[in-house]
Amino acid sequence: MIHDVSERAYQLERSGQWVKGKSCDTFGPIGPWLVTTDEISDPQDLGLWLEVDGHRYQDGTTKTMVYGVAYLVAYLSQFFTLQPGDVISTGTPPGVGMGVKPDPVYLRPGQEVRLGVDGLGEQLQITVSDE
């Protein structure tokens, strides 16, 4: 699993591609381990969740992904050769803080972020300021 972290100020206030807001140092932690295809019976049937300070913001499954795993592998294979050990990030379930209405929620220093994928484990990060 990958924590799909976004620096929204980079994405919203600095125009251009959104990828720059996902490419900061320490963003995109992977783990607690990687699994191979023989270790997951159905990659389109995994629960996904994320909590901030104990409040669950995201709770979904891989069934609701815009693009399935097989499609993503086939599509990306058209542009470059995938090798054993390559990692493809598939995105995030519904419920991102920026989409909270009427007032978006953004991470602040010191907050505890926990996320997990059923059967694959959990991650825990404490947010810090870059200043």
Model segments located where?
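Catalytic-pocket segment enriched in acidic/His residues
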Residues: 8-131
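Extended Lys/Arg-rich, glycine-bearing segments that form polyanion-binding/interaction patches
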Residues: 1
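Active-site glycine-centered loops adjacent to acidic/histidine catalytic or metal-binding residues
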Residues: 4
